[in-house]
Regions:
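Exposed beta-sheet edge and beta->alpha loop/turn motif
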Residues: 53-100
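Short solvent-exposed beta->alpha transition segments
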Residues: 1-62
Length: 100
């Protein structure tokens, strides 16, 4: 199976877990190193009403987060295979431009 399809499959599991309200389960997808230094994605997941996987390129995915306060964010997730499992190794968070 291609890297893109493997990553897309695990990202769908991440999305489903998040949408079930299982933030702890979603955080289990973080690589240990990322979990130690993350100060943005984890808090956003706690505020997420739902997430929507909107794209995959290689080992990167885009997730559209709809937050409980009505705001939204698009998050680029970098997935790396560690010890036989795909984990989130880094994330970049984008705010959508207002009125555009």
């Amino acid at each position: 199976m291609s890297v893109k399809l493997e990553v897309q499959r695990v990202a769908r599991t991440f999305e489903t877990t998040l949408n079930a309200g299982d933030v702890e389960g979603a955080n289990a997808h973080f690589a240990a190193e990322f979990a130690d230094r993350d100060n943005e994605l984890g808090p956003l997941l706690e505020r997420a009403a739902r997430g929507e996987l909107i794209g995959t390129v290689g080992n990167r995915t885009l997730l559209h987060l709809h937050l409980t306060d009505g705001e939204t964010r698009v998050v680029e997730l970098l997935w790396l295979e560690l010890h036989g499992a795909w984990r989130i190794h880094d994330a970049r968070v984008f705010s959508l431009l207002a009125d555009e």
